[in-house]
């Protein structure tokens, strides 16, 4: 779910006052934490940066016993459509590790270059102890995303309605994540943006739109476990005309993932993305198209229970943007390409909303607004939602109250974002975790 330039500024201001333990989202006292990270076999074998040579010289202690590690192993196959919860498939509570990439150590600050591998592994343990975080939370969310999206890729066909597609993805997500209030559930509404619409479209009640064979469909959905959100997106087309557009955007996203890392400057990441994206051009319908970055859409960091944490990752060069990525942060690296002008504006009926992380204290004069805010706090907190989710909860005649919450700054609306009519847009996105010892692309799969 992308950040616009305007939304990024607002998120940055909110971050200054943000506490990861929002009262609305507080987990029950006494809740048990998941398995400790050192039980994950894959991670134990991940060398810390600069540690490989030391390992070669280190002598193995005679008679030393290695602690037996748990591995991520599914004990059953998933159904079609997906319906088996992940905790039943992985009963030991250990979920598949994402793609591990080593950092480019030349980008590290001097202070970090002096840190030993042992110290980095200790930091990794400490990060997981903070607020009860465990890497298996976000890995569980990522495995849900992989299984649901791969079924969606096999199933989505022209002739299906947008509502049918959204329900299929969200029903699968709810089943596999074993939805349980703020403990686990949907991370944000399923985006199904078509053609020139790049982001933030999901069908409202009564939407009759049908997927056509010539459409370019962006599928963007999120999964959360204990507030750790996996945000990942892909694009589908059903005719080969715009295959080169999809290839350009996918390559740009992979470039962003490669360039990201501890101490990486966000402006430099954006410049690398733009260079790759805009090196592509192709012929379609008798015209030559240079792929353009949609310059006012950006990637972003992800905070607990907040899809936009406060930092934005541009997809174009931004001179003098020296903000750095930091150890322990989670980022959504997403890029958007267009055959249009490379700039989006609000377009069409709004469906996406989110309560502000730190809403202002205002007097709500409309009764329906007060009631609706209670429903939002109880069911979503600061997580994004859509009108269909309110319908599902039995809310009725809520539009006046919803508009009042938006006008008072309590709720932020996210209208569909579109480039010029007639153009095509594409999106690919991955969630990455900047661990002390390595970069983990948690949402990576065989599909993208």
From Swiss-Prot:
Required co-factors: Co(2+); Zn(2+); Mn(2+); Fe(2+)
Region of interest (Disordered), residue spans: 1-87
EC number(s) recorded for this UniProt protein: 3.4.11.18
Protein's recorded name: Methionine aminopeptidase 2
CDD domains listed in its UniProt record: MetAP2
Subcellular location: Cytoplasm
The keyword Iron is annotated on this UniProt entry: no
GO cellular component: cytoplasm
Function, in words: Cotranslationally removes the N-terminal methionine from nascent proteins. The N-terminal methionine is often cleaved when the second residue in the primary sequence is small and uncharged (Met-Ala-, Cys, Gly, Pro, Ser, Thr, or Val).
Enzyme class: hydrolase
GO molecular function: initiator methionyl aminopeptidase activity; metal ion binding; metalloaminopeptidase activity
Biological process annotations from GO: proteolysis
Residues annotated for a divalent metal cation 1 binding in this entry: 220, 231, 429
Residue ranges with Acidic residues bias: 35-46
Chain positions recorded as substrate binding sites: 200, 308
Superkingdom of source: Eukaryota
Main localization (coarse): cytoplasm
Catalyses which reaction(s): Release of N-terminal amino acids, preferentially methionine, from peptides and arylamides
Compositionally skewed regions (Low complexity) per UniProt: 1-17
Bias (Basic and acidic residues) ranges: 21-34
